[in-house]
Amino acid sequence: MFNFSFSKKSIQRYVVGVAVLAASVSLTACSRYFSDGKAQNANKVVVLTPFPNATAEELAAAFTAETGIQVEQVLDSTTKILARLRIEKRNPRGDVWYSGGGCIPFMTAVKEDLLAPYIPKEHSQIPEKRGNLTMRDKSWRWLPLAIVSQGYCYNPQVTPYSEIPKTWDELALSKWKGQIEMWDPADSGTSMLFLAAAIQRYKKPNGDESVGWEYLTKVFHNLKRYTREGKPAFSVARGDTKIGLHFESQYLEFLDQQRSDDQLSHVQDNIAWYLPPESPVIADAIALIKDCPHPENGRRFIDFCLSSEGQKIINGYFFSIDPTLPPPKGLKEVTLDTLLERAQKLDLEWTAENYDRLRKQWQNTVEAANN
């Protein structure tokens, strides 16, 4: 059981070894997912996630090794997972959804009655709030999996730290025209959080969003392209673009894909991650899908992800909800205290209520008017 209070002291870095036994993990294509329905082996759990592949596979293998329950994973984008849950509302095929570029898509799913409540016995002390950070749904229909923050990658060989944009405002300056890359908000929870955070940053007390949309239009003009394959970090590391919008977990996964441990410093010569002041810092989430085919196995999978072993695996790329674990390896001086100090105060309820509207407005008033 974790103590969920955050220490204000700096968290010391250490390497956590995780032993994972061999286990059978089924990574299925969408066609198989849709054709199977509920007539499935009871000794399995169907998991939907956009999580980094390596971490998702490690979690699944460790869970199977501990419980004997097979994990069938559908790896897809947040937007597509949410759309799938809406389509399947009367006949869900998945049991658990975890990670969505933060908890906001889960809040949208709660409003649409797509998720089921679950209070884990070992973690019933998780508070609803920790300072400005929302830690769980008030009705326990989603739970915290990790803490994520949104910043951007840059290439120190191309753009020294002294020259990078130090605030989100600066991304709208004309000097960055053709130098920014991100995923399409139509598919990406990461990019949707960027839009929502920007609108809230500039929104006036009377609700006027015009300044925020002017800012986003300028950022759109500065985009080189949407990332269609891989991560924006690839283009940044190659020197094709100067700024790539990323959660720290996505940046750390990129590092891991490029090197072995003894090459970390060499890889970081070409890529670094920066967290500006007033950045989105939120809980990433895990939830049981309402009326899922394997609810008990789904609850056990959630229990495992919140356990010490599960959190040690997640800690490879993420800040754990267990404050005794160190920052993920590869972030240098960034600690949990850094995240909390630079966190933007977000109205997550407003964001969830306006999630689809913001995406459509981006498409209709920014993309369509400026292409």
Mark where each language-model region is.
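Short, low-complexity disordered leader/linker segments with a strong preference
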Residues: 1-44, 370-371
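Early extracytoplasmic/lumenal segment of secretory-pathway proteins
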Residues: 30-107, 371
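Extracytoplasmic ligand-binding site segments that recognize negatively charged/polar headgroups
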Residues: 50-57, 80, 93-240, 254
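Short beta-strand->loop
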Residues: 115-125, 142-143, 169-172, 261-280, ...
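Periplasmic-binding protein-like
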Residues: 148, 178-187, 213-219, 223-227, 264-290, 304-327
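A bilobed periplasmic-binding-protein/Venus flytrap-type ligand-binding module shared by bacterial periplasmic
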Residues: 153-158, 196-200, 282-294, 313-317
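An extracytoplasmic/periplasmic, membrane-proximal ligand-sensing/linker region
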Residues: 320-371
